[in-house]
Amino acid sequence: MKVTLLGASGGIGQPLSLLLKLHLPAESDLSLYDVAPVTPGVAKDISHIPTSVEVEGFGGDDPSEALKGADIVLICAGVARKPGMTRADLFNVNAGIIQNLVEKVAQVCPQACVCIITNPVNSIIPIAAEVLKKAGVYDKRKLFGITTLDTIRSEKFIVQAKNIEINRNDISVIGGHSGVTILPLLSQIPHVEFTEQELKDLTHRIQNAGTEVVEAKAGAGSATLSMAYAAMRFVVSMARALNGEVITECAYIEGDGKFARFFAQPVRLGKNGVEEILPLGTLSAFEQQALEAMLPTLQTDIDNGVKFVTGE
């Protein structure tokens, strides 16, 4: 199993590299790439940690060497959010970066599962899809926007609010990965009930948790450490699924188009990527209303990504 991390030397990339070295399946290969010349040094640094994951690092303008033979490509390259910026403000900078990297993926390792955390995810995944499609190698089962940060925040905030233990698959977060498009299905969590006000307050906190971190860091960055943990958790699940385990995760994917062409939803992962899109179950009245209200925003985000590549 080979995992390639693109953007390995940044604020998310370095802690994520460390977490992957610690948690990827035994005997995995971890390839780190970043334009920053420090990247081989990051690889050398974590290579001294005694796990069976083998690490190598590559710097420079061309990620091709790092991508050779990759089963999973994880992309966190791009600029981070700053105070006052929305994820959409990041679009013009990060869109071009992702387009260039995904073009390289299409050339070097077209069969790889591509997992992206670069924001704005709602628009970046459509860009990646159109680039892969243009190259003739698009398999929608193998392209993922990682929304796991919304899931882990939901888990933590629910435990804080209700003082209960929940399992990681008890909570589905659907829709997209910014603001009102983030919709945790709190009503479906077993053995716990929420008042209407609790549902609204908790949903609002989950939707705005990224801003909470940006403001708390007072201009010095965004959610990097929790994002690194979330990305590690998803990629380890992906690696286990490719090795034959049946794994359930939420991710932003191109699905059946019921709500939008790209939509975050629970999926069953397997050897081919997405093996099955799982039903959403019954939504509460509040959740149904929130779902319907978010769709125009999500659609605009998707359209922006598609237009960036196709010009249409």
From Swiss-Prot:
InterPro entries hit by this protein: L-lactate/malate_DH, Lactate/malate_DH_C, Lactate/malate_DH_N, Lactate_DH/Glyco_Ohase_4_C, Malate_DH_AS, Malate_DH_type1, Malate_DH_type1_bac, NAD(P)-bd_dom_sf
Keyword terms, alphabetized: NAD, Oxidoreductase, Tricarboxylic acid cycle
Family matches, as SUPFAM superfamilies: LDH C-terminal domain-like, NAD(P)-binding Rossmann-fold domains
Superkingdom per UniProt: Bacteria
Enzyme Commission designation: 1.1.1.37
Subunit and interaction comment: Homodimer.
Protein name in UniProt: Malate dehydrogenase
Species this protein is from: Actinobacillus succinogenes (strain ATCC 55618 / DSM 22257 / CCUG 43843 / 130Z)
Gene name of the record: mdh
